[in-house]
Structures are given as structure tokens and as C-alpha cells.
Amino acid sequence: FGLLVGPKALDGIDLATTDSVVRTLAEATLALVLFSDASRVDLGHLRRAVGVPLRLLAVGLPLTILLGAAAAAVLFGQLTAAEALILGIVLAPTDAALGQAVVTEPRVPQRIRQGLNVESGLNDGICVPLLFAAVALADLESDISGGRGAVRLLVEEIGYGVAGGVIAGIAIAVIIRAAGGRGLIASRWYPVIPAAGAGLAYGMASALGGSGFIAAFVAGVVFRLALGRDPEQLNRLIDEVGDVLNGVTFIIFGAVLLGPTLTVLSWQLILYAVLSLTLVRMIPVAIAMWGTHAGRPTLGFLGWFGPRGLASIVFAVIVVEESRLPHEHLIVLAVYLTVGLSVLAHGLTAGPLAARYATWYESHPHDRRPAMESAATEMTRPRGHATDAVPPAARGEPV
């Protein structure tokens, strides 16, 4: 929609101001999403269940980054090794929101939906420090003295980000526990606390010189651990606001960022975008699932549904703001084109392919269904799908 209305919507608008609005909106949205996603995942269960999510994160994600960097180095010969690595990292995180029908289709095996959902919830947070490290490496490559400053900045970004996240996560968990035990907060105000906590983590880390994104992600993890349960009801406001901001971000992305990108296309950019959404994702997924006896339809399903979205857009903004890369414009063009193609391709195929995959799975008799896909697992709630609107404290239950 943003792409269609872009030329008319931008008529007479200061693009410099618009770019600033896009950056602010996208960064705020990602901070909320990082907090919400991190707080939804039970890390203890993830450690115990050495299954699809752990394989996709521990094996698939690093291989996706490396293969994406290799493809960038081959197609864009002007990029340095560090710049190619940056492009690989920026396009590694997946965005399950772009294929919502996949993780919410009840006929798709729960273990497969869980794998894609958890992968999407954690890989953007994992990639944030990797991106800062790659940017520091690029600066070190081009200027030794400046690179040393970049390394110091990297340590500060991660260190202060973690510190801000830990403090904010513990603080909001303590507030909810204390207030819940004494009935100090009306039930309708509970969802405000995590939203404020995400903002507190981001603001505290940024003020100290750290990464607000790392802080938001860490705050979500710590909040979940300190609270001792899935804060699904408490995150209702974050989920709803995040969904709205996410939609607005993509509309503006199409109007402001994607449109100009389409005017400077090259065959290398198009080929890289196609490879990024196919082989660069599918080969690592197939390797990660080696030995699980997953069926070919399952490997294809997991490999295809790795949409690129919000995190990649914000990471591209970080590259522009935090680095002095000689070819940052090329990196940004590749990212924007890949995300735009992903929005179109995954949006159109999510429903039909989820139904087709479910039909394949259900075509097997109950006693002969594929073992890997049929294994029972605890399902993590997809973003924005709370099951209970009232916090336990408001019902008189312990928090």
C-alpha cells in the first residue's frame, strides 16, 4: 500500500524529515517487539527441548549469515569482507509476523509452528550484538585508530545495553509482584508496566551509551525469569501497540524507502534478494535439520518461511547511523529490496502453502504420521495472541 501511494503521499514532504520519522518509528517498534518476543520464550524449555528452534538458532542462523555474506562477496565485488558480513547479518533475522498464517494455522504440526515462532522471536535479539561487532570490524578494517574506538564503542554498546536491560527487567517484575500481592494496581493498568519497562530499558541504555535494542531484548528475558511465568496478559498492550506500529512502519517503508530503491535496480541486487530468500535460507535450514528425519516438505516449509522484515529495516538504519562504510548505500539497497520482495512473496504464499503443507501432513494415517513433525512440544504463544486478559494478581492468584 505504501509503495502505491508513495509518489502522491510524498509530494511536497521534506524527505529528510520523513526519513527521521521512519527511523524513530521503526526503532520504537523493534524495541517493543524485542521485549515482547524475548519475554514470551521459556528459555528453560528451549534448553531442554533440543529440537527445531535450537537447531535453527544454533546451526541455521550462523550458516545463514555466512552464506549470505559469501553471496554478497561474489555478487558485489566492491564490498569488503566486513561489509559483506554486515549484509549477511542484517538479512539473517526472520519476521514471523509477515507469515502469520503459518504460525497460527492449527493444522500445521505444532512442533513446526513452534520452531518458526521461537526462531523469529529470538534471532533478531541475537543478531544485534553480532551486527555491532561486524560494524566495529569494518571500521577496524578501514582505519586502525578509528577501529580501536569502534571496538571500545562495541563493548559499551553491549555492556551498557545488558546492564540497562537487567535493571529494567528486574524492576518491572518486582513492581508487578509487589503491587499484585497488595492489590495496589487496578487490573486494567497492569499491561502498562511492561510497556513502560521496555521504554525504560531502551532509554536507560541509550543514556549510558549502550544499545537500546540489546537492553529491550535482555529486559524481556530477565522480566520473564524474574516473574516466573509467561507474561502473556501483561504484554497485551505491547503486542497491540507493536502490531499497529509495525503496520505503519511497513506502509511508510513502502512509501519512503522501497520506492526510490526500485528506481536503481541492477541484476545483482535482484539476484541477491532472490538468493537471500531462497538458497541462503534453505540450505542452512536443511543442514540444521540433518539427522532429524524431517520430510522434504517439512524442510522446504521451514526453509521458505523465513520472511525478512522489521529487524532488517532497523538494522539497515543502524548501519547508516553507526558506521562509516564506503558502500553503505549498496548494503541498504540490497536490504530494502529483499524486505520488499519478502513482504510480497511471503504475504502471498503464507496461507496457501500452510494449507498445502497441513494437507500433506494430514494425508498420513494417524499411526503413520512423520515422527519428527508429530513429536509433542510446548507451544509458545505467537505475538499478539494472549489467551487471558486478566492478570493473575487481579484474580487474587499469586504472581
Where are these regions (language model features)?
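Transmembrane helical cores of multi-pass secondary ion antiporters/exchangers
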Residues: F1-P398
